[in-house]
Amino acid sequence: PAEADVILLNTCAVTANAVTDARQAVRRLQREAPGVPVVIAGCAAEVARKQLAALPGVLRVVEQDHKSRLLDAPPLVLFAEEAAGNVTPFPSSPAEAAARAATRDRTFPPFHIDGFRRARPVLKVQDGCSHGCAYCIVPLTRGPARSRPPKDCLAEMRRLLEAGYREIMISGINLRQYAMRDEGCRDFWDLLSYLDGELAPEWGSGARPDPARFRISSVEPAQLTERGIATLAETRMVCPHLHLSLQSGSADVLKAMRRGHYTPEALLSAVEGVAKLWPRFGLGADILMGFPGETEAHVLETLEVVRSLPLTYAHVFPYSARPGTVAAELPDQVEKAVRQERAARVRAVVEAKREAFWKDTLTCERLLVALDCNEDAGAASGQHGVDECYVPCRLRTPLRGEGHTLIPVRPVSLSRKGVIVEPVRP
């Protein structure tokens, strides 16, 4: 950091702790690189702009709507003193921040990626969210839902494939709200079908010696409709892996969260349909325990859903109140120790499912692993990556010159961190 002209700090604000972490990061950078100006972007820049701007060494706090200008050249033009006069005043209240978010630009910002340091680049096709879950600050920090034009998505996908990448993550803040109807895509499933139809003949399995694949970052349970599952069945390049924004297995809690657009029963039925499509598939979920008003009966409902789902992993969080959200003002807040205990109970069930799936992976004759050849990993630790079902894998013996490609391997043993594999040679 000390050799930099300017340090750009991209921040998160999904929890109150994330904003605290951003402030601590600025202070740490000032110790490590005294005198180097810091420019702050990201979600914390939207909800905690005033506090961050007051920190010593901070040259500029860039709003989300202006973030794309960071790509301009020369970048230091953005940080000139006279530009400060164009910054929107700080919102004086959460209500004002919400009103501002509702009027923000709905155009997807122009940018593209030609290269990526890791093995699995991210293709961002959607940003923002217009739903408004009770616990979530994202609509304020990221603004309303915005979708990337399909042809733009395809062009970037081609650039990444031609650069040698063989697994690409299709990502968005809320893929359920993807829509470009004027360009032939009613929803995310239309986009996925379009990308697969255009690329599979050249890049799909069987089309070339080094095929490529897509991975979907996360889907809303309500997206798993009959048409959605049918689209997955028709694609040739999508990994057999889904990550669900589940949040709770209780219908009552989902309604309190303002997530009543799906029910646990409908989700279980949809996942049964996915299981018929993919005999072996990875299934992850985000689960939030201890939401205000959650009772022991609700916890038992969630545990029953978790036991019923063929989960292979899950991110289980104890709820934490986020200032500026509806949930932070709700009555019947659950004590911190109880929240943590409930999350631990769910994690224990998920952990058993994860271990069982890893053991089952040992019965597979062949896996295709996207290796992460990041220089920071170091050859001494062995290269690591994920298989098509998102099982973490590590090569028993490191390979050289295999970055970004899909490596055929066979599983040989288990470790605490995943499956140990070795290459399958032709």
Regions picked out by a protein language model, each given a short descriptive name:
Residues 77-105, 114, 184-185, 197-212, ...:
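Intrinsically disordered, low-complexity coil segments
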Residues 116-119, 129-131, 238, 248, ...:
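Short flexible coil/turn linkers enriched for glycine and charged/polar residues
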Residues 172, 218-220, 246-248, 285-289, ...:
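Active-site proximal loops enriched in glycine and acidic residues that flank catalytic Cys/His/Asp
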